[in-house]
Amino acid sequence: KGLYEIGTSFHVFNKSNQGITPTVYYQFLHDGESNQGSAFMPSFTGTAYYSEEEDFEKISFDDVKGENNEFKSKVINNGWIGIIQRYFVSSWILPSKQDRKFFSEEIDNSNIYRSGVLTPLEIMPKEDISINVNLYSGPQLKQDLEKAAPGMELTVDYGMLHIIASPLFSVLSGIQKFVNDWGVSIILLT
């Protein structure tokens, strides 16, 4: 309860007498629907990624639709990629300095989208390796996101009310830590 980071581990043994160069895929699928928010306060649903070089970026599913994919892929050696929607985020968090290629695309004009990361490996003959990657999948709780990976807290989107909402949420979180109940925290804040 209360833990949203899942450690994943893959074990690969190259039994051959030749080196191999497999690629590991980590991806999410989304149906492209975003029936969340209102016309006055819309919420973003789509791909998001973070890297030290480019900071935090959001990519709407419309931007990766069909042949006009404006994102396609991005090759870097740090950061994370995920899918965000109102109140929730899921992201793959790879170890730093590990080469990776982020991607986001529509699958066969189906309004189904995949976003993820490819990681090339080099495995020598008779070598056996372990690959450890974290998956964060849970609510956009700023304190948990800050612990998960650099830039994850940027997935919290208060929209145009950010200047008011951000400090208010910090106070609300402080109350929640004390009373351990979000409902009671909201009542006490208001």
PLM feature spans:
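Soluble non-transmembrane domains of integral membrane proteins
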Residues: 1-155
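Interfacial loop/helix-cap signal at membrane boundaries in integral membrane proteins
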Residues: 136-185
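Cytosol/matrix-facing ends of alpha-helical transmembrane segments
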Residues: 187-190
